[in-house]
């Protein structure tokens, strides 16, 4: 990292108290103010949860529709051999609608010109053959995130409106996108409250003690800001 880049980080970190957990609106303002990226950075929310991720029922994974969108434009590909579903997906705003044969050719040629794939369930046996290619790129459709569905047009509509995925890692940490630094504070706050409410509802019944141990908000290039956990 350049000396200039290091100084930007130091200045950002010194502009607030990293040991304090801030009210949500104030935390958002700090994140917006301390983002030192030259582009419209993403805003990410991170939860440290008291989970035993070795147990299947404590592995949180899914997607959440943010009321004010993600602020990010995504390219959605739909794969289905059903002609009627292809028409509906196109009408819903899918960027690409392909059949299984076309998709297979794209994968073989390493053409991954899309951000999210939505699949008709009938396509999963085919996609399963390419899990080693799709999985590491985060492109394998999954029922838990709503990207394996008999109604792909609905998934396209939700993704275009602003749907964000979340997933627990091995340390019991959940990351999710909640917007862009250019968004109004009020809109970011509303998005974040939606995610926090969801995480609270998803608390596994077997969890004892403090469930949400820590919440941190940050921009792509910016310091993490602790968020006060409201009971």
From Swiss-Prot:
Pfam families: Ribosomal_L1 (PF00687)
Biological process (GO), any one: translation
GO cellular component, one term: large ribosomal subunit
Keyword set, alphabetical order: Repressor, Ribonucleoprotein, Ribosomal protein, RNA-binding, rRNA-binding, Translation regulation, tRNA-binding
Top-level taxon: Bacteria
MF-aspect GO terms: rRNA binding; structural constituent of ribosome; tRNA binding
Function: Binds directly to 23S rRNA. The L1 stalk is quite mobile in the ribosome, and is involved in E site tRNA release. Protein L1 is also a translational repressor protein, it controls the translation of the L11 operon by binding to its mRNA.
Subunit structure: Part of the 50S ribosomal subunit.
HAMAP family recorded: Ribosomal_uL1_B
Database matches in PANTHER family: 54S RIBOSOMAL PROTEIN L1, MITOCHONDRIAL, LARGE RIBOSOMAL SUBUNIT PROTEIN UL1M
Similarity section: Belongs to the universal ribosomal protein uL1 family.
Name listed for the protein in its UniProt record: Large ribosomal subunit protein uL1
Organism of origin: Mycoplasmopsis agalactiae (strain NCTC 10123 / CIP 59.7 / PG2)
Gene encoding the protein: rplA
